[in-house]
Amino acid sequence: MKLLVAEDEPKTGIYLQQGLREAGFNVDRVVTGTDAVDQALNEAYDLLILDVMMPGLDGWEVIRRLRTAGQPVPVLFLTARDGVDDRVKGLELGADDYLVKPFALSELLARVRTLLRRGSSLQVQTSLQIGDLQVDLLKRRATRGGKRIELTAKEFALLELLMRRQGEVLSKSLIASQVWDMNFDSDTNVIEVAIRRLRAKIDDDFEVKLLHTCRGMGYMLEAQDEG
Protein backbone atom coordinates (compact mmCIF):
# COMPACT_ATOMS: atom_id res chain seq x y z
CA MET A 1 0.00 0.00 0.00
CA LYS A 2 1.29 3.45 -0.92
CA LEU A 3 0.62 6.39 1.41
CA LEU A 4 1.27 10.12 1.18
CA VAL A 5 2.02 12.04 4.39
CA ALA A 6 1.69 15.84 4.27
CA GLU A 7 3.23 17.21 7.48
CA ASP A 8 5.39 20.33 7.76
CA GLU A 9 6.71 19.72 11.30
CA PRO A 10 9.97 17.78 10.72
CA LYS A 11 9.96 15.67 13.89
CA THR A 12 6.34 14.55 13.42
CA GLY A 13 6.82 13.95 9.70
CA ILE A 14 9.88 11.75 10.18
CA TYR A 15 8.16 9.88 13.04
CA LEU A 16 5.14 9.18 10.83
CA GLN A 17 7.18 8.15 7.82
CA GLN A 18 9.40 5.81 9.81
CA GLY A 19 6.54 4.26 11.79
CA LEU A 20 4.42 3.63 8.70
CA ARG A 21 7.34 2.13 6.80
CA GLU A 22 8.18 -0.18 9.68
CA ALA A 23 4.54 -1.31 9.52
CA GLY A 24 5.12 -2.31 5.89
CA PHE A 25 3.71 0.67 4.00
CA ASN A 26 5.30 2.52 1.10
CA VAL A 27 5.40 6.17 2.21
CA ASP A 28 6.08 9.49 0.48
CA ARG A 29 6.24 12.73 2.47
CA VAL A 30 5.71 16.37 1.52
CA VAL A 31 5.80 19.48 3.70
CA THR A 32 3.45 21.91 1.94
CA GLY A 33 -0.17 21.78 0.89
CA THR A 34 0.77 22.73 -2.66
CA ASP A 35 3.08 19.73 -2.94
CA ALA A 36 0.40 17.51 -1.41
CA VAL A 37 -2.06 18.45 -4.15
CA ASP A 38 0.53 17.97 -6.90
CA GLN A 39 1.62 14.57 -5.57
CA ALA A 40 -1.92 13.29 -5.00
CA LEU A 41 -3.03 14.26 -8.50
CA ASN A 42 0.02 12.81 -10.25
CA GLU A 43 0.74 9.65 -8.24
CA ALA A 44 -1.50 6.73 -7.25
CA TYR A 45 -1.94 6.59 -3.47
CA ASP A 46 -4.11 4.32 -1.35
CA LEU A 47 -4.40 6.87 1.48
CA LEU A 48 -3.45 10.48 2.30
CA ILE A 49 -2.52 11.63 5.81
CA LEU A 50 -2.87 15.42 5.93
CA ASP A 51 -1.89 17.91 8.61
CA VAL A 52 -4.50 20.67 8.75
CA MET A 53 -2.09 23.56 9.33
CA MET A 54 0.54 23.63 6.57
CA PRO A 55 2.34 26.38 4.65
CA GLY A 56 1.14 27.14 1.15
CA LEU A 57 -2.29 25.56 1.34
CA ASP A 58 -3.88 24.28 4.53
CA GLY A 59 -5.39 20.82 4.78
CA TRP A 60 -8.90 22.14 4.16
CA GLU A 61 -7.88 23.63 0.83
CA VAL A 62 -5.90 20.53 -0.13
CA ILE A 63 -8.88 18.22 0.24
CA ARG A 64 -11.19 20.78 -1.39
CA ARG A 65 -8.97 20.86 -4.49
CA LEU A 66 -8.59 17.09 -4.61
CA ARG A 67 -12.31 16.45 -4.38
CA THR A 68 -13.03 19.17 -6.96
CA ALA A 69 -10.58 17.43 -9.29
CA GLY A 70 -12.46 14.15 -8.79
CA GLN A 71 -9.74 12.51 -6.68
CA PRO A 72 -11.55 10.18 -4.24
CA VAL A 73 -8.50 8.85 -2.35
CA PRO A 74 -9.23 8.30 1.38
CA VAL A 75 -7.97 11.11 3.63
CA LEU A 76 -7.03 11.04 7.32
CA PHE A 77 -6.65 14.49 8.89
CA LEU A 78 -4.12 15.21 11.64
CA THR A 79 -4.58 18.34 13.74
CA ALA A 80 -3.72 19.88 17.07
CA ARG A 81 -7.21 21.43 17.20
CA ASP A 82 -9.89 19.33 18.86
CA GLY A 83 -12.91 21.52 18.22
CA VAL A 84 -16.15 19.93 17.02
CA ASP A 85 -16.45 22.55 14.29
CA ASP A 86 -13.06 21.58 12.87
CA ARG A 87 -13.94 17.89 12.81
CA VAL A 88 -17.27 18.60 11.13
CA LYS A 89 -15.62 20.88 8.57
CA GLY A 90 -13.09 18.22 7.63
CA LEU A 91 -15.70 15.51 7.27
CA GLU A 92 -17.99 17.77 5.24
CA LEU A 93 -15.12 18.53 2.85
CA GLY A 94 -14.68 14.82 2.23
CA ALA A 95 -12.23 13.59 4.88
CA ASP A 96 -12.66 10.00 6.00
CA ASP A 97 -11.23 10.26 9.52
CA TYR A 98 -9.75 12.75 11.96
CA LEU A 99 -6.98 12.22 14.54
CA VAL A 100 -5.98 14.80 17.15
CA LYS A 101 -2.33 15.40 18.09
CA PRO A 102 -0.60 14.10 20.10
CA PHE A 103 -1.52 10.57 19.12
CA ALA A 104 -0.14 7.08 19.66
CA LEU A 105 1.36 5.43 16.59
CA SER A 106 -0.67 2.30 17.36
CA GLU A 107 -3.90 4.29 17.07
CA LEU A 108 -2.78 5.91 13.82
CA LEU A 109 -1.93 2.50 12.35
CA ALA A 110 -5.30 1.10 13.43
CA ARG A 111 -7.13 3.97 11.75
CA VAL A 112 -5.02 3.69 8.61
CA ARG A 113 -5.75 -0.03 8.30
CA THR A 114 -9.45 0.54 8.94
CA LEU A 115 -9.62 3.14 6.17
CA LEU A 116 -7.74 0.87 3.79
CA ARG A 117 -10.11 -2.00 4.53
CA ARG A 118 -13.13 0.23 4.13
CA GLY A 119 -11.75 1.60 0.91
CA SER A 120 -13.81 4.78 1.22
CA SER A 121 -15.11 5.61 -2.25
CA LEU A 122 -12.27 3.67 -3.87
CA GLN A 123 -12.06 -0.03 -4.51
CA VAL A 124 -8.81 -0.55 -2.63
CA GLN A 125 -6.62 -3.29 -4.05
CA THR A 126 -6.07 -5.87 -1.31
CA SER A 127 -4.12 -8.54 -3.17
CA LEU A 128 -1.66 -9.00 -6.01
CA GLN A 129 -0.91 -12.11 -8.06
CA ILE A 130 1.50 -13.26 -10.74
CA GLY A 131 1.46 -16.90 -11.73
CA ASP A 132 1.08 -18.91 -8.52
CA LEU A 133 2.65 -16.15 -6.39
CA GLN A 134 0.07 -14.31 -4.32
CA VAL A 135 0.42 -11.35 -1.96
CA ASP A 136 -2.16 -10.29 0.61
CA LEU A 137 -1.61 -6.54 1.05
CA LEU A 138 -3.68 -6.24 4.21
CA LYS A 139 -2.21 -9.18 6.10
CA ARG A 140 1.24 -8.50 4.59
CA ARG A 141 1.62 -12.14 3.60
CA ALA A 142 3.03 -13.84 0.53
CA THR A 143 2.46 -17.38 -0.70
CA ARG A 144 3.56 -19.33 -3.72
CA GLY A 145 1.86 -22.54 -4.73
CA GLY A 146 0.04 -22.38 -1.41
CA LYS A 147 3.34 -22.28 0.53
CA ARG A 148 3.84 -19.38 2.96
CA ILE A 149 6.89 -17.22 2.22
CA GLU A 150 8.45 -15.43 5.18
CA LEU A 151 9.57 -11.92 4.21
CA THR A 152 11.10 -9.00 6.07
CA ALA A 153 9.36 -5.61 5.81
CA LYS A 154 11.86 -4.44 3.16
CA GLU A 155 11.56 -7.68 1.19
CA PHE A 156 7.78 -7.33 1.22
CA ALA A 157 8.00 -3.70 0.05
CA LEU A 158 10.37 -4.76 -2.74
CA LEU A 159 8.10 -7.61 -3.82
CA GLU A 160 5.03 -5.35 -3.72
CA LEU A 161 6.76 -2.79 -5.95
CA LEU A 162 7.80 -5.46 -8.45
CA MET A 163 4.31 -7.00 -8.47
CA ARG A 164 2.53 -3.69 -8.91
CA ARG A 165 4.72 -3.04 -11.94
CA GLN A 166 5.07 -6.60 -13.21
CA GLY A 167 6.38 -6.86 -16.73
CA GLU A 168 8.32 -3.59 -16.34
CA VAL A 169 12.09 -3.40 -15.96
CA LEU A 170 12.76 -1.44 -12.76
CA SER A 171 16.14 0.26 -12.44
CA LYS A 172 18.25 0.11 -9.30
CA SER A 173 17.78 3.84 -8.78
CA LEU A 174 13.99 3.52 -8.90
CA ILE A 175 14.03 0.58 -6.48
CA ALA A 176 16.37 2.46 -4.12
CA SER A 177 14.13 5.54 -4.06
CA GLN A 178 10.86 3.63 -3.72
CA VAL A 179 11.87 0.97 -1.18
CA TRP A 180 14.79 2.52 0.71
CA ASP A 181 13.99 6.22 0.17
CA MET A 182 17.56 6.92 -0.86
CA ASN A 183 19.53 7.89 -3.93
CA PHE A 184 21.22 4.93 -5.59
CA ASP A 185 24.93 4.62 -4.83
CA SER A 186 26.83 2.51 -7.36
CA ASP A 187 29.34 1.63 -4.64
CA THR A 188 26.77 -0.22 -2.55
CA ASN A 189 25.35 -3.66 -3.26
CA VAL A 190 22.23 -3.31 -1.11
CA ILE A 191 19.90 -3.75 -4.10
CA GLU A 192 21.72 -6.85 -5.39
CA VAL A 193 21.69 -8.44 -1.94
CA ALA A 194 17.97 -7.72 -1.47
CA ILE A 195 17.13 -9.12 -4.92
CA ARG A 196 19.22 -12.23 -4.27
CA ARG A 197 17.49 -12.88 -0.95
CA LEU A 198 14.04 -12.28 -2.43
CA ARG A 199 14.80 -14.55 -5.38
CA ALA A 200 15.91 -17.31 -3.01
CA LYS A 201 12.57 -17.11 -1.24
CA ILE A 202 10.17 -16.80 -4.17
CA ASP A 203 11.98 -18.69 -6.96
CA ASP A 204 14.59 -21.19 -5.76
CA ASP A 205 12.11 -23.91 -4.79
CA PHE A 206 10.00 -23.53 -7.92
CA GLU A 207 10.48 -24.61 -11.52
CA VAL A 208 9.03 -21.48 -13.11
CA LYS A 209 11.15 -18.43 -12.30
CA LEU A 210 9.45 -15.07 -11.83
CA LEU A 211 12.21 -12.64 -10.83
CA HIS A 212 14.48 -11.80 -13.76
CA THR A 213 17.69 -9.77 -14.04
CA CYS A 214 17.90 -7.56 -17.12
CA ARG A 215 21.64 -6.93 -17.27
CA GLY A 216 22.61 -3.30 -17.34
CA MET A 217 18.99 -2.21 -16.89
CA GLY A 218 17.46 -3.59 -13.70
CA TYR A 219 15.01 -6.22 -12.54
CA MET A 220 11.60 -7.45 -13.64
CA LEU A 221 8.91 -9.70 -12.22
CA GLU A 222 7.22 -11.67 -14.99
CA ALA A 223 5.77 -15.13 -15.53
CA GLN A 224 7.61 -15.74 -18.77
CA ASP A 225 6.41 -18.37 -21.21
CA GLU A 226 8.84 -21.26 -20.94
CA GLY A 227 7.88 -22.40 -24.41
Swiss-Prot record:
DNA-binding region (UniProt annotation): 125-223
Enumerate the spans annotated as Response regulatory domain: 2-116
Q: Does the keyword Glycoprotein apply?
A: no
UniProt protein name: Transcriptional activator protein CopR
| Species whose genome carries this gene | Pseudomonas syringae pv. tomato
Q: Which GO terms describe its molecular function?
A: phosphorelay response regulator activity; transcription cis-regulatory region binding
Compartments, as annotated in UniProt = Cytoplasm
The cellular component terms of Gene Ontology attached to this UniProt record, alphabetical and capped at eight, are: cytosol; protein-DNA complex
What does its PTM field state? Answer: Phosphorylated by CopS.
- Any one GO BP annotation for this protein: regulation of DNA-templated transcription
Task: Point out the gene that encodes the protein.
Answer: copR
Q: Name one Pfam family in it.
A: Response_reg
**PROSITE patterns named in the record:** OMPR_PHOB (PS51755), RESPONSE_REGULATORY (PS50110)
Q: Which residues carry this modification: 4-aspartylphosphate?
A: D51
Name the keywords, alphabetized.
Activator, Copper, Cytoplasm, DNA-binding, Phosphoprotein, Plasmid, Transcription, Transcription regulation, Two-component regulatory system
Q: Which Cys residues form disulphide pairs?
A: none
The record's principal subcellular location, in a coarse class, is: cytoplasm
Q: Which PANTHER family match?
A: REGULATOR OF RPOS, TRANSCRIPTIONAL REGULATORY PROTEIN CUSR-RELATED
The reply on keyword Lyase is no
Q: Which domain of life is it from?
A: Bacteria
Q: What does this protein do?
A: Member of the two-component regulatory system CopS/CopR. Involved in the activation of copper resistance gene operon CopABCD. Phosphorylation of CopR by CopS would convert it into an active state to induce expression of the cop operon by binding to a specific site on the cop operon promoter (cop box) and possibly by facilitating the binding of RNA polymerase to the cop promoter. CopR also binds to the chromosomally encoded cop operon promoter. May also be involved in basic copper metabolism.
